[in-house]
């Protein structure tokens, strides 16, 4: 610690919506935290300016004192310095009040009490002081509803199934107990023991975001963390780097399986496993990969956590089959979107009507960037991108055909405000945190209620207001029904007309059909049919001319 940096620190006024005036009185909790911070800082200053070691805390009887003695003394000092503040949640009655306020539903056996503040974890779980410091420095001051419940459950060593709205702090909810548990269990272990923490996510973009938060929280701690990127995978395969040097790995399923099958990564020591966006990872296309990973995590006391904004009953059944007596936490309604999102359904009649609707929104001032527009396919995303370029909008497109580096660059530019409108497929529908997105437009209706909740969850994050507009045509009359149900559960009945609600309910077969088969749609274009026909005729004439020339060349050679 740099003592001169501490002594030269000045005051700083933090911009916050919670501070109404310059002279507003701090809350009891703020006073408590500031006093605790001041005491800790004062002790560190006293300790570092005691250059001649005259104070008791640095005295030693001989120069031969063992490392263990120093460790014990340091632990005693920490206990004296960090007297835990009183718990905010102390009784069952306190927990009932908190759960009612947070709309939390918790089921299972022997459920731990929730926490009311991050400081509660000091007294109850001896939360690492540096981890708490990293949290507060990153301005994570108050736990969200999902964090209040999931942190004590996970730190008590219980398996967890957690469902909470998008933007509610789920990443932090699983990273804090993951780090804390490994800090405790890693004491006394040899160096390069191996991977003990594993986080699985369905997309590379989400994995990068999780890794970035992991780096912030582990700052100053002896935990080696990594994201299994293409570059790291190559190094592991070529034995340039050994996987055993890492404590925590964040990865997508397929890349991890490839490395495991090549015997370059050992998952048998994994103590903490987190499956983020569990509904996606247990859906078709991912379930076999997820199952393969689980089969390699053979540690007998492994703790498993599953998080998502939507967890269908089928996924929950699978979760119960691979977990030990899990606790289930639902924040809000299971299939509802965040209540900070104003949702609206717009009937456009046809594909051409969608483009007209967007242009009308621009003219009427409803089009307020930053905006994300979702489409069902790469082909359609590219087509809309070219159409909006003609309208001179500051727009870019991101999809699976672009390289990871290109996607990272586009995301970075969008976050920095260089891009106002981002067109994408479902590759960005999950987990990726874009702060300040004003609106999400579903240009194409998503195929499931879960996909809808995740898409619109890119706005209205962290308690901020957001808007979600979904365009639909006659072809979408089946696919739009689950969305109406989500809107009802989210309290957005005003966002759709009465005749939409009266549409007949979908049968199971219809739901399956909509889920697994994309709707055939016309190409996105405002070019008149006559012009299209002339273009086609011209292309055919050019093609016929080329063929004639090729035949003439062949005949001449003969």
Curated annotation (Swiss-Prot):
Highest taxon of source: Eukaryota
UniProt-annotated stretches for the region Disordered: 26-91, 509-558
Cellular compartments annotated: Nucleus, Nucleolus
Reactions it catalyzes: ATP + H2O = ADP + phosphate + H(+)
GO cellular component, one term: small-subunit processome
Alphabetized Pfam families for the sequence: DEAD, Helicase_C
SUPFAM superfamilies listed in its UniProt record: P-loop containing nucleoside triphosphate hydrolases (SSF52540)
Residues annotated as binding ATP: 164-171
The keyword RNA-binding belongs to this UniProt entry's keyword annotation: yes
GO biological process: endonucleolytic cleavage in 5'-ETS of tricistronic rRNA transcript (SSU-rRNA, 5.8S rRNA, LSU-rRNA); endonucleolytic cleavage in ITS1 to separate SSU-rRNA from 5.8S rRNA and LSU-rRNA from tricistronic rRNA transcript (SSU-rRNA, 5.8S rRNA, LSU-rRNA); endonucleolytic cleavage to generate mature 5'-end of SSU-rRNA from (SSU-rRNA, 5.8S rRNA, LSU-rRNA); snoRNA localization
Motif (Q motif): 120-148
Major subcellular location class: nucleus
Domain Helicase C-terminal: 340-504
Residue ranges with Basic and acidic residues bias: 34-53, 64-81, 538-558
Residue span, Helicase ATP-binding domain: 151-329
EC number in record: 3.6.4.13
Keyword NAD: no
UniProt entry keywords in alphabetical sequence: ATP-binding, Helicase, Hydrolase, Nucleotide-binding, Nucleus, Ribosome biogenesis, RNA-binding, rRNA processing
GO MF annotation: an example: RNA binding
Domain remark text: The Q motif is unique to and characteristic of the DEAD box family of RNA helicases and controls ATP binding and hydrolysis.
Similarity field: Belongs to the DEAD box helicase family. DDX52/ROK1 subfamily.
Quaternary structure, from the entry: Interacts with the U3 snoRNA and is associated with the 90S and 40S pre-ribosomes.
Function: ATP-dependent RNA helicase involved in 40S ribosomal subunit biogenesis. Required for the processing and cleavage of 35S pre-rRNA at sites A0, A1, and A2, leading to mature 18S rRNA.
Protein name according to UniProt: ATP-dependent RNA helicase ROK1
Species the sequence originates in: Scheffersomyces stipitis (strain ATCC 58785 / CBS 6054 / NBRC 10063 / NRRL Y-11545) (Yeast)
């Amino acid at each position: 610690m740099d003592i001169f940096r501490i002594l030269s620190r000045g005051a700083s006024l933090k911009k916050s919506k919670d501070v109404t005036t310059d002279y507003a009185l701090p809350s009891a909790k703020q006073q408590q935290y500031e006093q605790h911070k001041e005491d800790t800082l004062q002790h560190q200053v006293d300790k570092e300016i005691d250059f001649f070691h005259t104070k008791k805390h640095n005295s030693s009887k001989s120069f031969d004192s063992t490392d263990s003695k120093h460790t014990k003394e340091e632990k005693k000092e920490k206990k004296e310095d960090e007297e835990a503040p009183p718990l905010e949640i102390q009784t069952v009655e306190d927990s009932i009040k908190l759960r009612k306020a947070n709309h939390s539903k918790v089921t299972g056996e022997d459920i731990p009490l929730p926490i009311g503040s991050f400081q509660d974890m000091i007294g109850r779980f001896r939360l690492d002081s540096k981890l708490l410091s990293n949290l507060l420095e990153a301005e994570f001051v108050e736990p969200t509803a999902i964090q209040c419940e999931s942190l004590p459950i996970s730190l008590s060593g219980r398996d967890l199934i957690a469902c909470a709205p998008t933007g509610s702090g789920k990443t932090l909810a699983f990273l804090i107990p993951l780090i804390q548990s490994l800090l405790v269990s890693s004491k006394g272990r040899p160096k390069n023991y191996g991977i003990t923490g594993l986080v699985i996510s369905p997309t590379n973009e989400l994995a990068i975001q999780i890794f970035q938060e992991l780096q912030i929280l582990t700052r100053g701690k002896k935990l080696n963390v990594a994201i299994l990127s293409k570059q790291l995978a190559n190094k592991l395969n070529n034995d340039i780097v050994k996987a055993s040097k890492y404590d925590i790995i964040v990865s997508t399923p397929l890349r991890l399986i490839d490395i495991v099958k090549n015997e370059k990564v050992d998952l048998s020591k994994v103590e903490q496993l987190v499956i983020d966006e569990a509904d996606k990872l247990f859906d078709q296309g991912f379930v076999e990969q997820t199952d393969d990973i689980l089969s390699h995590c053979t540690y007998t006391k492994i703790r498993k956590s599953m998080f998502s904004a939507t967890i269908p009953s089928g996924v929950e059944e699978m979760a119960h089959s691979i977990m030990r007596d899990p606790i289930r936490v639902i924040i809000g309604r299971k299939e509802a979107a965040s209540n900070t999102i104003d949702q609206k359904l717009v009937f456009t009649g046809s594909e051409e009507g969608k483009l007209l609707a967007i242009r009308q929104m621009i003219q009427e001032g409803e089009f307020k960037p930053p905006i994300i527009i979702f489409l069902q396919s790469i082909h359609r995303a590219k087509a809309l991108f070219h159409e909006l370029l003609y309208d001179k909008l500051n727009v870019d497109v991101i999809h699976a055909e672009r390289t990871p580096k290109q996607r990272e660059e586009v995301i970075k530019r969008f976050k920095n405000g260089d891009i106002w409108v981002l067109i994408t497929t479902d590759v960005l529908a999950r987990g990726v945190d874009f702060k300040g997105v004003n609106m999400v437009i579903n240009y194409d209706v998503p195929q499931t209620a879960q996909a809808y909740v995740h898409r619109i969850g890119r706005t209205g994050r962290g308690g901020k207001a957001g808007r979600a507009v979904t365009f639909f045509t006659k072809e979408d009359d089946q696919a739009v029904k689950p969305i109406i149900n989500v809107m009802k559960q989210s309290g957005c009945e005003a966002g759709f007309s009465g005749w939409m609600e009266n549409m007949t309910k979908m049968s199971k077969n219809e739901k399956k059909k909509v889920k697994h088969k994309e709707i055939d749609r016309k190409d996105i274009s405002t070019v008149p049919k006559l012009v299209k026909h002339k273009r086609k005729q011209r292309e055919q004439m050019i093609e016929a001319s080329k063929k004639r020339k090729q035949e003439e060349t062949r005949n001449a050679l003969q």
